[in-house]
Amino acid sequence: ASDKGVTYESIEGDSSIQLAYNTMEIPPRAEFQLVLSDGTKVWLNAGSKLRYPERFVGDERQVELSGEAYFDVVHDEKAPFIVKTSRSTITVLGTEFGVRDYEGKANLTTLVQGRVAVCDSMNKSYVIYPGQQVIIDERGTTVEDVETAYFTSWKDGYFTFNQATLGDIMDELSQWYDFDCFFTNSTVTNLRLTARLKKYDDINVLLDILSDTGDVCFSRKGRAITVTEISR
C-alpha cells in the first residue's frame, strides 16, 4: 500500500513483517542530512534521491541512491550496509564514503575511512581503501588514488576543484543552481581551473571568481549561462 510517499512492502518469507520505505528527494540548491534507524548518518546533495526503510531488519541494511550522498555508516559486522545505484552496489561494514551517481555522468565511489567493496554492472568487485575512488563510466571501471576532499567538501558547504575542466565545473554548478550552460566553442570546456567556492553564495559571485582568471567570461539570461573564451 502507499500513503503520502511512504511505500509498505512485505519481507519475502515472513508475511507477518511489514517494512515501511521512505523516499527522500532533494531539489536544486538544497541539501539534507538524515540519520537512519541504525544511527548511520547520510548527507544528500541537490538533485538526489534516497530510498530507505524506516527500520532495518534481517542480515543486511540496504538503501537505494540516485544523485550524490555522503555516508557515515555505523559498524555492524552481522549486517553489512549496502548502497545500490544504477551502476554499482557498494557493500560496507562501517566506514565513511561518498557516492555520486547522476544521470549521464561517471559513477564515483570515494572512500574516506574504512574499507568498501564496489560491484559494477558486470558483477566485478573492487575493494578499495581510504584515499581511493572507483570510477564507472562508458570506458569501464577503474580505481584511482584521489584527494578525497575534492569529492566530499560539498557536504561542508564548498565546491572544491583542483585543475578541473571548466566543463566539469559548470556541470557541478548547474546541478546545484539549476541553470543551463552553453559554451561558444568546445575547446573552452577543456580549460583547467583550481578554485574553492562557497555553495551558498549567489551564482553571480561564483562566476565573477571564475572570470577573474582572465580566460573566460560569462553572460547570463534567465536560466541560461553562456561561457566564452577570451582571446589573447
What do the PLM-derived regions correspond to, one by one?
Residues 1-232:
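A residue-level detector for the "anchor" residue at the start of short, highly conserved motifs
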